[in-house]
């Protein structure tokens, strides 16, 4: 299994698919499926029957998972999509960094 470069809370850029060119914050990473749920990206309509939780029922909009290969982390310095690397910092901890600018990604 490969390492995941995207974590919950990251700002990501969509590089393929229907929402190509948009950016959003990662709400959840689905490790087993190699997918992530991103705020405002890949929004689908879900038809729900009336139930105790939602007595009205109807159509609700929600974000569907998108594959991690279609996402790039946004560089905190330039605001553009970048690849991610890992290196040891001064304290000896492994941190993620932007390959474009060398800036550490929190």
Curated annotation (Swiss-Prot):
Domain of life of the native organism: Bacteria
SUPFAM superfamilies tied to this protein: Translation proteins SH3-like domain (SSF50104)
UniProt record similarity statement: Belongs to the universal ribosomal protein uL24 family.
Protein name: Large ribosomal subunit protein uL24
MF-aspect GO terms: rRNA binding; structural constituent of ribosome
Function noted in UniProt: One of two assembly initiator proteins, it binds directly to the 5'-end of the 23S rRNA, where it nucleates assembly of the 50S subunit. One of the proteins that surrounds the polypeptide exit tunnel on the outside of the subunit.
KW rRNA-binding (keyword) present: yes
GO CC terms, sorted: ribonucleoprotein complex; ribosome
Record PANTHER family: MITOCHONDRIAL RIBOSOMAL PROTEIN L24
Subunit structure: Part of the 50S ribosomal subunit.
GO BP of this protein: translation
Organism: Parabacteroides distasonis (strain ATCC 8503 / DSM 20701 / CIP 104284 / JCM 5825 / NCTC 11152)
Keywords: Ribonucleoprotein, Ribosomal protein, RNA-binding, rRNA-binding
InterPro entries tied to this protein: KOW, Rib_uL2_dom2, Ribosomal_uL24, Ribosomal_uL24_KOW, Translation_prot_SH3-like_sf
